[in-house]
Amino acid sequence: MAQPRYDDGLHGYGMDSGAAAAAMYDPHAGHRPPGLQGLPSHHSPHMTHAAAAAATVGMHGYHSGAGGHGTPSHVSPVGNHLMGAIPEVHKRDKDAIYEHPLFPLLALIFEKCELATCTPREPGVQGGDVCSSESFNEDIAMFSKQIRSQKPYYTADPEVDSLMVQAIQVLRFHLLELEKVHELCDNFCHRYISCLKGKMPIDLVIDERDTTKPPELGSANGEGRSNADSTSHTDGASTPDVRPPSSSLSYGGAMNDDARSPGAGSTPGPLSQQPPALDTSDPDGKFLSSLNPSELTYDGRWCRREWSSPADARNADASRRLYSSVFLGSPDNFGTSASGDASNASIGSGEGTGEEDDDASGKKNQKKRGIFPKVATNILRAWLFQHLTHPYPSEDQKKQLAQDTGLTILQVNNWFINARRRIVQPMIDQSNRAVYTPHPGPSGYGHDAMGYMMDSQAHMMHRPPGDPGFHQGYPHYPPAEYYGQHL
């Protein structure tokens, strides 16, 4: 039953006794008295088959070298005898292992360990469960049924029996450890891929969506739309995805106002000439509305938005939120009436536009309140425009404003710092550059400078800074990019 395949690959576990350990680690083990070379019951788990053979040959060499005199022989005759006796003892030990009843089971689990080490673990691979530990349990049950009817498990040599059992146990533990390592690797790969998908740049996600997008959106004009979308790279369906999460709060209401104003933050393109109303009976129109719901206003009017880049969209949205936060009370209530907010702020602004009043009910449910309460913002704005000559409160005034608004002194302080930089300073620059004050007053302003600023403030109330008409009336007013953050 000799199998040369396992001649050099098998390692024995627990076959050797104390004499074998002495022969392996002690060079003078062959010279010990025979009384110290008894075989204890303990089996070392690290002894190899070759070490056991060397130990056995060492014992034979001791007796042959000692002769009948009882004295240890010289080292060189024993070494010569060992060189000639190793092949015979080695062959006898190999035969004892190969002919053991448990050897087929040992060879089976050894092959399973090899397969578990080198086989790729993919869910679609056929036969991937052949090298699992559970399959080995089935193999043990089947093997026990077969061998029970033929011959017993153990032989007359308890040392070889112990070697086989412990070798099978060690390989079984090794198979379980391999499975655990594979499970940990699979878990790590799954979590790592999920993390990468969560942190993937949004432009890659948009490109992936564009690749999966159907090439045809309809017949006739649908083909023209798809060609224009592929060249513009600013499709309305992907525009909300380009914006960061912080700027997506105003999506749904403020964007529609901007879309209805001609050229507000947009670039005229081939798709800007669309019918004012969408025919709901048109199946192509329904399909387009389902793809691009952001292009329709709340009452169904078609409004196509095209920005030259995502940065322009963010700048226009930031300017809109600044306008609503400064002049309308809070950054997330852009659809409310301008007249009511301005009257609460004690600023002469005129009546709000009818378009804003129409959209108030539709946007009220889509918006969230800002960081500061609306009443507190109105109080702070009223104080600011009442003290434009020195638009910064003292410590006592800060405390009083904090009590009136319910804010902390630090919040009041930060609000006035931002307001002085973003509201008052542009107004002062506009007043100084305007050729409107022939008689400067004692404070550097003209006699009518305050009225001029208040009138200009009233005109600015009617449209957000992102509107080009806003900058046509006030050429020196900072552009929309100036308002990177709302107050």
UniProtKB/Swiss-Prot annotation:
Q: Identify the Pfam families for this entry.
A: Homeobox_KN, Meis_PKNOX_N
Q: Which SUPFAM superfamilies match?
A: Homeodomain-like
Q: Which GO terms describe its biological process?
A: animal organ morphogenesis; brain development; compound eye development; compound eye photoreceptor fate commitment; embryonic pattern specification; eye development; haltere morphogenesis; head morphogenesis
- Disruption effect? Severe head defects, including a failure of head involution and transformation of the thoracic and abdominal segments into a more posterior identity.
Q: Where is this region: Disordered?
A: 25-49, 210-292, 333-369
Where does the record place it? Answer: Nucleus
What range(s) does the MEIS N-terminal domain occupy? Answer: 127-211
Sorted alphabetically, the keyword list is:
Developmental protein, DNA-binding, Homeobox, Nucleus
- DNA-binding region of this protein: 365-427
- Nucleus among the record's keywords? yes
According to the UniProt entry, its GO molecular function terms are:
cis-regulatory region sequence-specific DNA binding; DNA binding; DNA-binding transcription activator activity, RNA polymerase II-specific; DNA-binding transcription factor activity; DNA-binding transcription factor activity, RNA polymerase II-specific; DNA-binding transcription factor binding; protein heterodimerization activity; transcription coactivator binding
Q: Polar residues bias located where?
A: 227-237, 333-345
Query: Where in this chain does the entry annotate a coiled-coil region?
Result: none
Q: Which Gene3D superfamilies match?
A: Homeodomain-like
Q: In which tissues is it expressed?
A: In the wing disk, the expression is present in the regions corresponding to notum, wing hinge and ventral pleura. In the leg disk, the expression is in the periphery region, corresponding to the proximal segments of the legs. In the antennal disk, the expression is in all but the arista region. In the eye disk, the expression is strong in the anterior region surrounding the eye field, including the regions corresponding to ptilinum, ocellus and head capsules, and weak in the posterior and lateral margins of the eye disk.
SMART domains of this UniProt entry? Answer: HOX
Q: Single GO cellular component annotation?
A: cytosol
What does the record give as the function of this protein? Answer: All isoforms are required for patterning of the embryonic cuticle. Acts with exd to delimit the eye field and prevent inappropriate eye development. Isoforms that carry the homeodomain are required for proper localization of chordotonal organs within the peripheral nervous system and antennal identity; required to activate antennal-specific genes, such as sal and to repress the leg-like expression of dac. Necessary for the nuclear localization of the essential HOX cofactor, extradenticle (exd).
| PANTHER family associated with the record | HOMEOBOX PROTEIN TRANSCRIPTION FACTORS
Q: Give the family, as the similarity comment puts it.
A: Belongs to the TALE/MEIS homeobox family.
Task: Name it.
Answer: Homeobox protein homothorax
What is the organism of origin for this protein?
Answer: Drosophila melanogaster
